[in-house]
Each structure stands twice: as C-alpha cells, then as structure tokens.
A protein has these predicted regions:
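Short catalytic/ligand-gating loop segments at beta-alpha or beta-beta junctions
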Residues: 132-140, 160
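A short linear hydrophobic-aromatic micro-motif
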Residues: 134, 149-151
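Post-Walker A helix-loop "phosphate-sensing" segment adjacent to the P-loop in P-loop NTPases
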Residues: 96-101
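Active-site-proximal beta-strand elements of phosphoester/diester hydrolases
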Residues: 151, 168-173
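N-terminal beta1-alpha1 cap of cysteine-dependent amidohydrolase-like domains
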Residues: 1-87, 94-95, 107-121, 125-128, ...
C-alpha cells in the first residue's frame, strides 16, 4: 500500500472535502501499488495509517499547515520512503531550513515544459540515468534554499533528496501528469513504488 497525504478544500456548497489527484492514484496502480488516501486530521490516527503503508507520496497542492510539516518530519525520522511532488517537495525542503520565493504573474500550465539539469551523483540520476530532461511547470512558489541535497536545478531548485534515508526525494514538477507520454517520468514511480514494496537496491 502506498499512502497519499490528502489535500483539503471546500466544495462549491461550502463543505470541507479532502482528495487525492486521479493521476497520482493511477500512477501508483500502474506500478503495482494500492493507493491509500490519508487525511491529515488527528495526529495519532494519521500516523497509524502511515505505519500501515510501504511508502508515502506528498502530493502537490495550494497550502500546507504545521500539521503537514509534523507529518513530513515523522516520515523522515522514521525512514519511511517518501516522494514529494511540487508543494510536497517544498514542505520537505522547509523542514530543513528551507526558504520559499514567489513567482509573480505565474500562469500554471502543465503543457509548458523546460529543461532541468540533474546532478550525476544523485539518486534522481540513478533512477532516470540522464542529466538533462524536460519537465512541466505548475508551481507559484519555489524553493530558494534548503539544507537537503539539491539533485536537480534550472533557474530554481527542481529536486531535493536526503542521502541519509532509504528514499526521501522531492521534485518540483508533476511527473504524474507526464506518465502517459514520458518514459522518464514513469521511472520515478516505478523505482519508488517497487522499492517501497519490495525493497530498494
């Protein structure tokens, strides 16, 4: 089972809702995992769900709270395989003295792609086996700095990781939306889900 930290929002009727993105769930299923939605609510209940999962995905979203950071800290402290996407990556970075910047007048567009450069000594390079790839852009904020290892950059930090954990990797882009046509993005989910379930090599 692969847990996904759910996002909170309000319906048009004003009801509180929690959700995971379909592309995230589909990516997990494609590589043999079972997606488990995890509500960020009561701390102990959330941890109980997390401890039943082989790995955790921190999906993208608009906002986060201290509750989210506390959960991310738990994931790191307990060496639970963790993949952070967009805001998820930013939360991982913030946990380690990270600073965020804002992109003024930015328009989200999953069809817009740009090139990033991957550190050849990083886990991300081990997974993708290329030092330059194209990724999409949807974020309004970006990570200026963090004490975690920076594994990919463009004009901003694009990926971070910890070399002290079995898998603690965050990416600024949305690989789940590129699964249908980009084999390199598939490799991220294949490695993470397979490793979480069967063990990392």
């Amino acid at each position: 089972m692969i847990g996904v930290l759910m996002n909170d929002s309000l319906s048009e009727e004003g009801h509180e809702i929690s959700y995971i993105y379909k592309d995230i769930a589909s990516s997990i299923i494609k590589y043999g995992g079972i997606p488990i939605p995890i509500v960020i609510d009561d701390y102990e209940t959330t941890l109980n769900l997390i401890d039943k999962c082989a790995g955790i995905i921190i999906q993208g979203g608009d906002t986060y709270t201290d509750k989210h950071l506390r959960i991310v800290n738990y994931l790191y402290d307990n060496n639970i395989p963790t993949l952070g996407i967009c805001l998820g990556m930013q939360m991982m970075g913030m946990l380690f003295n990270g600073k965020l910047g804002h992109i003024d007048n930015h328009k989200s567009n999953l069809n817009y792609v740009h090139e990033i450069t991957i550190d050849k000594k990083s886990l991300l390079y081990k997974i993708i086996k290329q030092d330059k790839i194209m990724v999409n852009s949807r974020h309004h904020d970006y990570l200026i700095s963090t004490d975690l290892n920076v594994s990919a950059k463009s004009d901003v930090i694009e990926a971070i990781e910890s070399k002290n954990r079995v898998f603690f990797l965050g990416v600024q882009w949305h690989p789940e939306t590129m699964i249908a046509y980009d084999i390199l993005q598939n490799k991220i989910f294949e490695y993470f889900i397979g490793g979480s379930i069967y063990g990392f090599k």
